Design a protein with these regions (language model features):
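Non-catalytic cap/lid and distal C-terminal segments of serine-dependent acyl enzymes
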Residues: 1-187
């Protein structure tokens, strides 16, 4: 299985962030590790074995990233500051990681344009994956979310503000209008 490791300084989060890519071609999949996870968890937890048939046959490329959960969902300091930090991580994914994924996917497959990305995660990674899919369906057009908690109550119990709401799929999907343009993208 072909792998590729890279890191760069992220202006969104203000530090270096690491990514590991598995595969040589195919549909892009963004893997978000379980709570407090790191980019190497996809490999360390032997997900590479489970995904090998699709990765090695060029059906998909998996991009595994770091989380900031230890500074956000798992931390205990002021919830407003924690959710602002989480939103910086979301911006890192949408503004930095997604374009990187789309560029590499195009290069490896000989494609043009902006290919949709499948968001994939387990546990809190599933929560983040679902949030990416529902908030940014123009970028994330597929979702595999296993055993997540899709409300912000888990990381921010008893606290709600605009950013917490924007990161709580149960809450914002309940408030979405049936004629919202995202509804068409979800289906």
């Amino acid at each position: 299985m072909q792998t590729y490791y890279t890191k760069w300084y992220s202006p969104s989060v203000g530090r270096e962030m690491e990514i590991k890519v598995y595969g040589h071609a195919g549909r892009p999949v963004l893997f978000i590790p379980c709570q407090d996870g790191r980019f190497f968890d996809f490999e360390n937890y032997r997900m590479t074995d489970a995904w090998a048939p699709w990765i090695e046959s060029g059906q998909c490329m998996v991009f595994s990233i770091d989380t900031l959960d230890k500074e956000t969902y798992s931390a205990t300091y002021d919830p407003h500051d924690r959710i602002r930090r989480h939103e910086a991580w979301m911006n890192y994914i949408v503004r930095e990681v997604a374009p990187f994924i789309q560029s590499m996917t195009n290069e490896r497959n000989g494609w043009d344009g902006t290919p949709g990305i499948i968001a994939f995660g387990c546990s809190l990674g599933a929560t983040h994956a679902a949030n990416l899919y529902f908030r940014f369906p123009e970028t994330f057009d597929g979702l595999l979310a296993l055993s997540g908690i899709y409300t912000s109550e888990y990381g921010f119990p008893g606290y709600m503000d605009e950013l917490v709401y924007a990161n709580s799929p149960v809450d914002y999907l309940a408030g979405i209008s049936p004629d919202h343009p995202f509804i068409r993208l979800y289906n």
